[in-house]
Amino acid sequence: MEKQNETAESSLKTYILENTPARIRERYAHLKDYAQMHTFGALDADVVVLDTETTGFSFNHDELIQIAAARMCNGEIVEWYVTFVNPGKEIPDEVAHLTNIHDEDVADAPDPDTALTGLVDFVGESLVVAHNVGFDRTFVTKRAAGATLKNNIWIDSLDLARIALPRLNSHRLLDLVRAFGGADSTHRADDDVAATCLVYRVLLAAVANMPAPLVAHIADMADVERWNSVYVFKELASSEAAPYSLFKSRKAQVAKVQADLFGAAELRADQEAELDRAKHATSRMFHGKHFWRTTTQQHRNACSSWRCCEYSIIASFRE
């Protein structure tokens, strides 16, 4: 067990940015254990983690070739829905090479409408979690058979990673899995779902370990209808948390460091770097207008919401 912990910590070090303070490295290193020892109420009592594989990236011209979904209750996978999907067209060579899904695998598979009908029945009214959620949500809801899933809350684990783990040098699913000691994904949808199940609970732990006033501050930035992922922050936010104040946060941390015989000047420089990281993480989540022109009106609304969120975050940092 000790050797496994050392290996996990070594993997995590590979993905943490240089000059990250030791206390932050230590906090990141304990997140997986924290996730294993805690539950997170409605956020993991009954959620469906989902991934899809497709013939390409075009929402207009490409089709599903695999759907995988796992129902997770308090950290345990209790039920699966996995199916190949016949796209009605040839699978491009590059996609077959990446996913190891070939034309013969999908030849006798259900068509997209049949597969999506099964998915809708499986998901029900549960929370849905996916990594880079816009891609999967668009592909499963663009047909009438899956359209009702637009009514579910979709949580993007990529959003959570960028906000709660800004000191990682990558927030790709594969890198997050490697950082926290999971098994490598094969780019099959079912493997990606298993990976996302692990990562999602680590990310819940990461948000739960953020300062409660900051979680509450983010929770107030948007409605769930406009930015589904804010549901995580609303659930974890303390109802009695005081408004977030950077000045008070700095003052408290300076006092702690002084008590440990460190210099306050060193801490201030460190915190300025952390603010830059947070602003950068927010800007990475905002893709810009050129991206949203090719997507749905819901995505355009989310873009507008994120612009407001970005300004709000930056303003709070300047207190």
At which residue positions do the language-model features occur?
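Acidic two-metal-ion nuclease catalytic site recognized across multiple nuclease folds
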Residues: 2-39, 201-311
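Conserved non-catalytic scaffold segment of RNase H-like nuclease domains
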Residues: 3-153, 166-187
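Acidic, Mg2+-coordinating catalytic module of metal-dependent nucleases/exonucleases
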Residues: 127-144, 168, 172-240
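Short, flexible loop segments at boundaries between secondary-structure elements
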Residues: 156-166
